[in-house]
Regions:
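Alpha-helical transmembrane segments of multi-pass inner-membrane proteins
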Residues: 1-8, 25-36, 57-67, 88-103, ...
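Amphipathic alpha-helical repeat scaffolds of TPR domains
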Residues: 466-486, 503-543, 565-584, 605-629, ...
């Protein structure tokens, strides 16, 4: 897990996040199975005691409770596109790996894990460097981007690349073997090179903080020496590289290298720090104990974001994370999660500072005092970065693994006496820590109880592994379906593939959302075939009627299932509203369902003018204000539509769609001059729009906006979200 997770990715609906989560959860559960197997084969169970383990348990409970009490359990527990690093299953995987490593690693395991950690960071950085310079290693289009890497964003990789530098600096000074020094130097140069090219300010801040921390650690825990003079000299040497890291970070904070030709690095996108804190405060005000639920930050962002964003390029964007991982965690996990995380940080920090210079520790290699100081400083680097930037999944894994490895180095660095055990349980003193050991005995109720617990753990791990495998299969099927061109000829195959994905993993809302859209397109295919016939034969056959009925039922069921799995997602409600809108001619009451879903979406994102305008259009159509057919206009609904359009313009005075429909209502109400002023504003911003020009001419000539006879009462179809600021096209 330490080595493969940062490097692994696959073609999926989330190339990096989902693939890493699937691998991580599978490896974590396999490690549990291996640990149980080792315990049974050894004939005894040993449990290393440490207070930090209680905070790990507290963090696990926080992840479970925050997911359970979330508005959308499966989204919080499994994650969703772009949101996997802090999902319930990811958090439990980190904590399982922490526990298994802490409880079972010996000296060899620890040494291998340290080299795997360093190697994974080095390979990730090297791959990222090759990509930046256009040397694409993988011959596939999705990966032939200069900013693509195996970790996440270029900023996430920059943090990941620099995170081992404090350890490398400390270990480099203590190791004597020139070959190891050469390897460490190559790693450091490669990782620094990537960070320098990206020039991410937060990476330099974190490096400076960790460098200062390393200086402080060395000051508080000087290396033992034969004499005070030698100790002073060793202390001075130990400060050289940490201070170099600090100076290096400060220099590159102010100095940026010239950009590489053809390389465009996008600026970090996300809410400001102040906005993030404001959203956190409002969320905790309503959901203080467990927060909004893991990986639900975009939902509370949509609900609480400031109206001023409507004047920016991000007016329709709901970010997956706040300005920092720490704020996101507090927002989504609540006070319980904050207490759990702070307890872990505090207890491990105290333990680490107390045990760095354990007097009876083996002082060589990775078990040396400088190596432990470097591990702690690298962990502080990650901790510092969490307060300034969202943490990518591989870096979050390192945040939990490094403390486990640090504690293992204390346990394994002890020289313990070999003893013959005459009792079935024993406490071994180990540098202030303790190991509890129980030997299995036939006929013992204690042994029976432990075996029962082990079987429960084993069964849970096997079930979890099976579930992860099913999710992997579902995602592979779904990706293959998404790669097929969505034409009428391929529609049945796509529907069958997505249905197979759902059969394998029925807990992914996005599968149902896509399925409902494809089913609706299939309905249009059937209707299109009917329309191709001569006019006298344009009536659905019994088979076609049955097919349309079946597709309608499946579409509605898919919409409802998506909403049930992800009820707080404004995008799901908008999709549902649009789907019901398309079913108006086929399903009685579909128009009311569309209105209900847009009202729900408006409650979840109250400052979005697009949603309000869409809702206003539905009320306007239902009011029959423009007199289609024999039904009398409903003035109450028309007034409601008008109020909604006015509110949309309050939210964004430049929102053209809302102004267009409001002006039509004003014209219908006899407020011709006000309507003319609004249409002139639209013409000023859309001078090439023929419909607007004609309406202005009509009003100036004293005739209704839509002319004589009026154009069809149904308002022009609103554009998609991406084009929502434009004016509706002229009806044909």
């Amino acid at each position: 897990a330490i080595f493969l997770t940062p490097l692994f990715f696959m073609n999926s609906s989330d190339t990096l996040g989902l693939s890493k989560q699937l691998l991580l959860s599978t490896l974590a559960l396999i490690s549990v199975v291996g640990w149980v197997g080792n315990v049974i084969s050894a004939g005894n169970i040993s449990w290393r005691k440490n207070a930090v383990m209680w905070t790990v348990l507290l963090s696990a409970l926080s992840a479970v409770f925050s997911s359970f009490f979330s508005g959308g359990f499966w989204v919080s527990f499994l994650g969703d596109a772009g949101r996997f690093a802090f999902s319930g299953i990811s958090m439990l995987s980190y904590l399982i790996i922490f526990s298994v490593a802490f409880q079972s690693f010996n000296k060899k395991d620890f040494t291998v894990a340290m080299w795997l950690w360093l190697s994974s960071v080095f390979i990730s950085s090297l791959f990222g460097l090759a990509q930046i310079f256009g040397k694409f290693i993988l011959p596939f289009d999705p990966y032939n981007l200069r900013t693509f890497n195996t970790v996440g964003s270029v900023f996430g990789l920059s943090l990941f690349a620099l995170s081992p530098l404090p350890f490398i600096a400390a270990f480099f000074q203590s190791v004597k073997d020139w070959r190891i020094k050469s390897v460490l130097l190559i790693m450091a140069i490669t990782q620094i090179a990537y960070a320098v090219l990206i020039d991410f300010k937060i990476a330099w801040i974190s490096l400076a903080i960790s460098g200062l921390a390393l200086v402080l650690i060395n000051f508080k825990n000087p290396t033992e020496a034969s004499s005070p003079a030698v100790a002073h000299k060793e202390y001075q040497k130990s400060l050289v590289l940490p201070l170099f890291l600090v100076v290096f970070a400060i220099v590159f904070w102010f100095v940026a290298i010239p950009p590489i030709s053809g390389l465009e690095i996008p600026a970090p996108a996300g809410p400001t720090y102040g906005a993030s804190i404001d959203i956190m405060a409002k969320t905790l005000g309503s959901q203080p104990v467990f927060g909004s639920g893991l990986e639900t930050f975009p939902y509370v962002y949509a609900k609480f974001k400031d109206v001023s964003l409507n004047q920016s390029d991000y007016w329709g964007t709901n970010f997956n994370d706040s300005a920092s991982a720490a704020i996101t965690w507090a927002t989504t996990s609540g006070i319980f999660g904050v207490v759990a995380l702070l307890s872990f940080i505090a207890l491990f920090g105290i333990y680490a500072f107390k045990n760095i210079a354990a007097s009876n520790a083996v002082n060589t290699g990775f078990f040396s005092q400088p190596a432990r100081a470097g591990m702690l400083a690298s962990w502080i680097f990650i901790l510092a970065s969490k307060f300034f930037y969202p943490t990518p999944l591989p870096l979050e894994l390192a945040f939990w693994v490094l403390p486990a490895l640090f504690i293992v180095s204390i346990f394994q660095g002890q020289t313990l006496k070999t003893q013959e055990f005459s009792r079935s349980d024993l406490v071994e003193s180990s540098g202030g820590d303790a190991t509890w050991r129980y030997f299995f005995r036939s006929g013992s109720f204690g042994t029976l109880g432990i075996f029962f617990v082990l079987m429960i753990v084993l069964l849970g791990a096997l079930i979890g592994s099976y579930f992860s495998a099913k999710r992997f299969v579902a995602e592979r099927i779904f990706v293959k379906a998404a790669a097929v061109e969505n034409t009428a000829e391929n529609r049945d195959g796509i529907i069958n593939s997505i249905t197979s994905s759902i059969s394998s993993d029925p807990y992914e809302s996005r599968y149902f959302r896509i399925l409902s859209q494809v089913l609706f397109q299939k309905m249009n295919d059937v209707v299109a075939e009917i329309q191709k016939r001569p006019e006298a034969d344009r009536r659905a056959t019994p088979e076609e009627s049955a097919q349309l009925q079946n597709l309608t039922i499946r579409t509605i069921n898919s919409i409802r299932r998506a909403a049930a799995l992800d009820p707080k997602n404004v995008g799901v409600s908008v999709d549902a509203a649009e789907s019901y809108r398309g079913l108006v001619s086929l399903v009685q009451g579909a128009e009311d369902l569309a209105i209900q879903n847009y009202e729900r979406a408006s409650e979840m994102e109250p400052i979005n003018p697009f949603i309000k305008t869409q809702l206003g259009q539905l009320y306007l159509v239902k009011s029959n204000l423009f007199g289609v057919g024999t039904a009398a206009p409903d003035t109450e609904l028309a007034a409601k539509a008008r109020g909604i359009f006015e509110k949309a313009l309050e939210l964004n005075v430049n929102y053209a769609n809302a102004r267009y429909f409001l002006a039509l209502i004003q014209d219908k109400a006899g407020e011709r001059q006000t309507a003319l002023e609004n249409f002139k504003l639209l013409r000023a911003t859309n001078p090439k729009n023929e419909l607007i020009a004609q309406i202005v001419q009509n009003l100036e000539n004293g005739i209704p906006a839509l002319g004589y006879p009026p154009q069809p009462a149904t308002p022009p179809e609103s554009p998609s979200t991406g084009a929502a600021k434009g004016v509706p096209p002229s009806p044909k």
